Amino acid sequence: MQRQELQQKKIAVLMGGLSAEREVSLRTGKAISQALTRCGYEVTDIDAGRDLAQQLEKTGVEVAFIALHGRFGEDGTVQGLLELADIPYTGSGVLASSLAMDKVATKKMLCYHGIATPGFAVMRRGQKICGTLPDYPLVVKPAREGSTIGISIVHDEQELAAGLEEAFRHDDLVLVEQFIAGAEVTVGVLDGQPLPIIQVVPKGGFYDYQSKYTPGQTEYLLPAPLPETLYGALQDSAVRVFEAIGCCGAARVDFMVTDTGFYCLEVNTIPGMTETSLLPKAANAVGMSFDELVERILAGASLRK
């Protein structure tokens, strides 16, 4: 949509929600709402609870900017509701959102498209592990959580049992993944075009929830100090992943880089927009202010039928 058209519509920023990432979503949503207000849009903030359909109807929303993270916001649920309500929205559609939120489905899609990803096995609550368990160390993850919630790095059977117990506190489906030692990098993709690569260097050694959202806990190298050929290959791979999943608007693709290559870890279809978030940092590196980034994402709002 054009800027002039959007400035005549009622825009809702959907934030908060019901997931374990609620607090991060509120920070993302507030930052987006303030940016849109500065740019002259009519903005309503909506805390997306179970009464979201009623809130949308009551406020007369015409366009939705989705600033939700985690379940019921990033997994296709809200996207489906907005499709039913005929309200254009930002970001990826129902299927891409659902695929990217499910780490197991994402891994299978990456394998299908020949995109390198760490070896893995899958476990459902009360069942045996499906697939061959990679060698230790391993990373144990709830399949449908974000912000590193419920993740453990394990080195033996005892730690694996504890890691599975923690992961099952958050999900009935768990991904057990080969641990890749290397440099963690992230590539933002905006409307199908890659942004500069950021290398993530957490001071604690592991990029956990605290490192992500506490200022000063992580060093960000922008642009990532990588050989030119590798840098270009990572950007190309990020776009391939974006297209394979079927993403729209803005997304972020995370990789581990080793001496022998790189591996795709996961895809984030609603990247954070807080003061420590990576997508705004990458956009700023190419001269795009936070407000301009928010407007660019808003301009892509549509129905994904």
From Swiss-Prot:
Q: Where does Mg(2+) 2 bind?
A: 266, 268
Reaction(s) this enzyme catalyzes, per UniProt: 2 D-alanine + ATP = D-alanyl-D-alanine + ADP + phosphate + H(+)
Q: Which PROSITE patterns match?
A: ATP_GRASP (PS50975), DALA_DALA_LIGASE_1 (PS00843), DALA_DALA_LIGASE_2 (PS00844)
Mind telling me which GO cellular component terms the entry cites? cytoplasm
Residue ranges of the ATP-grasp domain?
107-299
* Residues annotated for Mg(2+) 1 binding in this entry: 254, 266
Question: What protein family is recorded?
Answer: Belongs to the D-alanine--D-alanine ligase family.
Q: What is this protein called?
A: D-alanine--D-alanine ligase
Record lineage: Bacteria, Pseudomonadati, Thermodesulfobacteriota, Desulfuromonadia, Desulfuromonadales
